[in-house]
């Protein structure tokens, strides 16, 4: 076990804050769903509380013995309780995490790194969401550990409001991203103006 601890220490950043611990996952395994499918949409008509953000997101999974999405999903189910960032932008962070983890990881030593760099359009309901011009620099490490397995999850999200306009897509409701958003209890409501889009409630 001491040997495992030494290995784990090498795949953590030295400057990260004290990680948050989560409890053990259930025994049942998850069902693998197909990767996200994106369908082109026309321009959104509702412009209320809509903002473009240039996103730089990264989720780094550190585990000497590999990992399963069952445990990642279990960790993310506790996200509301362990999130340490700006709570006006927790919905944005959840969206980025789900999209990043629905992509393909890049191996980096004993880590697997999921990255997302793109411009995303967000719409918040009512007066929710970040203040005008507000930016986000969020970084947190979350760990899951027992006698047989260790997983460290390093999450970094940078979000800056921008005026870059990209294509608009609709994500398949059976995608892994939607599965992860459900695990994180992402709060949304369907837009009354655009039936294929949702408004963030957090």
Curated annotation (Swiss-Prot):
Gene3D superfamilies: Rhabdovirus matrix protein M2
The keyword Membrane is annotated on this UniProt entry: yes
Keyword Phosphoprotein: yes
Annotated region (Essential for glycoprotein binding), positions in chain: 115-151
Membrane topology: Peripheral membrane protein
Single GO BP term: viral budding via host ESCRT complex
Site (described: Involved in the inhibition of stress granules formation and contributes therefore to virulence): 95
Residue window of motif PPXY motif: 35-38
Pfam families membership: Rhabdo_M2 (PF04785)
Annotated keywords: Host cytoplasm, Host membrane, Host-virus interaction, Membrane, Phosphoprotein, Viral budding, Viral budding via the host ESCRT complexes, Viral envelope protein, Viral matrix protein, Viral release from host cell, Virion
Compartmental location: Virion membrane; Host endomembrane system; Host cytoplasm
Gene Ontology MF, one: structural constituent of virion
GO cellular component: host cell cytoplasm; host cell endomembrane system; membrane; viral envelope; virion membrane
Homology family: Belongs to the lyssavirus matrix protein family.
Entry note about domains: Late-budding domains (L domains) are short sequence motifs essential for viral particle budding. They recruit proteins of the host ESCRT machinery (Endosomal Sorting Complex Required for Transport) or ESCRT-associated proteins. Matrix protein contains one L domain: a PPXY motif which potentially interacts with the WW domain 3 of NEDD4 E3 ubiquitin ligase (Potential).
Subunit comment: Homomultimer. Interacts with nucleoprotein and with the cytoplasmic domain of glycoprotein. Interacts with host ATP6V1A; this interaction plays an important role in virion uncoating after viral entry.
General remark: Most abundant protein in the virion.
Role description: Plays a major role in assembly, budding and uncoating of virion after membrane fusion. Completely covers the ribonucleoprotein coil and keep it in condensed bullet-shaped form. Inhibits viral transcription and stimulates replication. Plays a major role in early induction of TRAIL-mediated apoptosis in infected neurons. Inhibits the integrated stress response (ISR) in the infected cell by blocking the formation of stress granules.
Protein name: Matrix protein
Organism expressing this protein natively: Rabies virus (strain India) (RABV)
Upper taxonomic lineage: Viruses, Riboviria, Orthornavirae, Negarnaviricota, Haploviricotina
Chain's gene name: M
């Amino acid at each position: 076990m001491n040997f495992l601890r030494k290995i784990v220490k090498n795949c953590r950043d030295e400057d990260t804050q004290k990680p948050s611990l989560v409890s053990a996952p259930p025994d049942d395994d998850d069902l693998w769903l197909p990767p996200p499918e994106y369908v082109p949409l026309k321009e959104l008509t509702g412009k209320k509380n809509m903002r473009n953000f240039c996103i730089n997101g990264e989720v780094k999974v550190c585990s000497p013995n590999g990992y399963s999405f069952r445990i990642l999903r279990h960790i993310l189910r506790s996200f509301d309780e362990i999130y340490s960032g700006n709570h006006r932008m927790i919905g944005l962070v959840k969206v980025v995490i789900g999209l990043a983890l629905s992509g393909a990881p890049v191996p980096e030593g004993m880590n697997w790194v999921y990255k997302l760099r793109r411009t995303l359009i967000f719409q918040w309901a009512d007066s929710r969401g970040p203040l005008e011009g507000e930016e986000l620099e969020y970084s947190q490490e979350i760990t899951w550990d027992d006698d047989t397995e260790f997983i460290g999850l390093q999450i970094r999200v940078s979000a800056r409001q921008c005026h870059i306009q990209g294509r608009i897509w609709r994500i398949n409701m059976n995608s892994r991203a939607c599965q992860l958003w459900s695990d994180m209890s992402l709060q949304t409501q369907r837009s009354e103006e655009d039936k294929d889009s949702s408004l963030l409630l957090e």
